[in-house]
Regions:
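Short hydrophobic targeting helices and cationic amphipathic motifs
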Residues: 4, 8-9, 15-18
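Positively charged n-region of N-terminal signal peptides that target proteins for export
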Residues: 42-45
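Bacterial N-terminal signal peptides
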Residues: 47-57
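Acidic/histidine-rich, surface-exposed loop or edge segments in extracytoplasmic proteins
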Residues: 69-87
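Zn2+-dependent metallopeptidase catalytic core
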Residues: 81-159, 193, 197-200, 207
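Zinc-dependent metallopeptidase catalytic helix centered on the HExxH motif
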Residues: 158-253
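Acidic/His/Gly-enriched intrinsically disordered linker/tail segments
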Residues: 212-286, 297, 305-352
Length: 352
């Protein structure tokens, strides 16, 4: 599910010291003999005062940094966890983030916030979260942060996972915030691992859209879930299936279950038509199948590399045509009118 701030909600070392290291301008002027200050020192002091007045000082000073959005980084992800989250869950999340970043590149800045089942602990984590937001962007209003529409107590109550992409024309800080929880799926469920991969593939998708304009980002990523969620789901399950110790038939089993959603399509409806909401699961499931179908007709590189490389400059439809040789409309028609009518056995042949 996508919220207006670019927040994805997928249905289906814990730093304690959050104080920033601050670099102040304040030089120390020692007392001079006779109480007199040389003219040169007075001039330096005057210039420093002007700098403070012009640019701010201390915690409220935001140092302009080069915009490296979309470039891989050596900066590690940050991990924060509620007090009721076991260290084993933090380590599990780190492990699967590493699998994803090794496969698709390390993009950031990225934070993971891991919520347990205690609403009290989640409220404490919310306060910590808002302190971090204020630290990274002094313009953050704590009241609004603490009372945002979907906070950590919702995750403690309902579970699930999500990505909040912070990239707009208002905020000074751009980055990615992934939230994991203690249920739906929980850390003891196998699905927890591909869900970490799923959320990180959303990071990969958004890292390839440089624009700060909300409408541009929505257009390039597609408003309805068929494309972004289908892509994240298939690529996550595909990568998970290739890991050591995962049973050989895993991917076919998962994808066969997803085909059940084809029976829920309405007459004349395509996955592109289905918005986020109560029927979004159809777009998640069959969107994953559409990406598998697309890759079977081209290649993994055409989807994962070529398309996203061209997306920002060419736009969605031209990047699609360049990468796959046909329009999205034509391939969606083939997918619905031909592929989904094949036998189950024939459909599963495209799954590696």
């Amino acid at each position: 599910m996508i919220f207006s701030a670019g927040f994805f909600l997928r249905g289906i070392n814990n730093p304690r010291n959050l104080d920033a290291t601050r670099t102040g301008l304040g030089p120390t002027f020692g007392a001079l003999q006779g109480g007199q200050i040389p003219r040169a020192a007075m001039k330096r002091a005057f210039l420093i005062i002007l700098s403070i007045l012009g640019f701010g000082h201390g915690a409220n000073c935001v140092v302009a940094q080069a915009d490296t959005w979309g470039k891989t980084t050596a900066r590690p992800a940050e991990f924060y966890a509620a007090s009721d989250v076991p260290a084993s869950q933090v380590e599990l999340t780190k492990q699967w983030h590493q699998v994803a970043s090794r496969a698709w590149g390390n993009f950031g800045p990225l934070e993971f916030w891991i919520v347990g089942r205690s609403e009290k602990a989640a409220r404490e984590l919310d306060r910590k979260y808002c302190a971090v937001r204020k630290q990274k962007d002094p313009g953050t209003v704590l009241h609004y942060c603490l009372n945002r529409s979907h906070n950590f107590t919702d995750y403690a109550r309902d579970g699930n996972a999500g990505l909040n992409t912070r990239r707009n024309e208002r905020d000074k800080w751009s980055g990615f915030i992934i939230t994991m929880s203690g249920k739906n799926p929980g850390p003891r469920e196998e699905d927890y691992k591909p869900v970490v991969l799923h959320e990180y593939f959303h990071v990969y998708q958004h890292a390839h859209i440089h624009s700060r304009k909300e409408q541009t980002r929505k257009s390039l990523n597609q408003t309805n879930p068929w494309w972004s969620e289908g892509g994240a789901e298939y690529m996550a399950q595909l990568l998970y299936s290739r890991q050591k110790g995962v049973r050989a038939n895993y991917l076919k089993e998962v994808m066969e279950r997803k085909l059940r959603s084809s029976g829920s399509l309405q007459e004349g409806e395509t996955i592109r038509d289905i918005p986020y909401g109560r029927r979004a699961r159809i777009a998640y499931d069959l969107g994953a199948w559409f990406i598998a179908f697309l890759i079977s007709k081209s290649s993994e590189e055409a989807y994962q590399v070529n398309f996203f490389k061209a997306l920002e400059t060419r736009g969605f439809e031209r990047a699609f045509l360049d990468s796959f040789g046909q329009s999205s409309k034509a391939l969606l028609e083939e997918f619905h009118n031909h592929f989904l009518s094949l036998s189950r056995r024939s459909q599963l042949k495209i799954i590696p």
